[in-house]
């Protein structure tokens, strides 16, 4: 420490008693535990911020597959087996995955849907390796048995069929993905590619309904393409929600809210954002909309993206908040269009300067 000051346990304990909801409370709590003398009462635990459901949009729920009755120990073993399968596929070791599927361990721990999940993943591995017949051989039966739970199995069969010029099969499986998946990005992509398969297969009467499905997700890549092909206008909402006095009053009623407003006033926006991020975890829908307005107006792009995604998981929220343009300028100014830079930052880190990937990439643009 620059002043060589060493905090005493009583100071840390008193601090935790007052500020257990502080963003740095967990670090101070760990330090207090290390400094705690024997037989002293422990410090107050840091506040656990729960994530409340504040969705203002809708995402189609996936059906829950039947589960095999397992003990807690067996569930851990099954999860470990799935991790091993994913690791083998990342390495391209398809033979190792086949051996795992044929093992007594897999038959003992995996349900039918679990086995089909592994078969579909193996099919995806073969597709990535350019072995389309093998991809269909493994993912096809999995899609037939468990496709309603595993739309990714249909996706693998569809892509492999397309590459083999089996357009009728490709269209059928793409349509199955569009019907069963719950991701707007996947649904729009599947519907668009199903339309393309019908176009190549000379079934023009089936194209427009599928493009209309894709066009219903206008914030996705394939949704935008579909809308352009149908001659539809993209109705983006570049405004941000209004900041109402009720939001400020609500923030003033909590310690975290008061701290955040004070920090914004003295220019400590990053620290204020951490306070508001914690507060958003227990905010109701009205307060969450208010926090979105605050984040959009005070240069908090990471919080704005996070809140807009939570409030509108199916899209259709405030595009000005979901695709922010923060008041950031690099030394020497921008040499390329700043919209492109911000687009890359949103994709790579969602504007979190402390983002770190498992591969070691760091920062806003996830540089290695």
Role assignments for model-derived ranges:
Residues 65-80, 108-115, 241-254:
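TPR-adjacent "capping" and linker segments in tetratricopeptide-repeat scaffold/adaptor proteins
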Residues 152, 224-251, 255, 262:
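Active-site substrate-binding loop specific to GH73 endo-beta-N-acetylglucosaminidase modules
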Residues 1-22, 31, 49, 103-122, ...:
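Catalytic glycan-binding domains that act on GlcNAc-containing polysaccharides
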Residues 250, 260-266, 272-275, 280:
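Long, internal scaffold/assembly segments composed of regular secondary structure
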Residues 2, 6-16, 38-58, 63, ...:
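Short coil/linker segments at helix-helix boundaries
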Residues 20-78, 82-88, 96-100, 134, ...:
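Non-catalytic accessory/assembly modules
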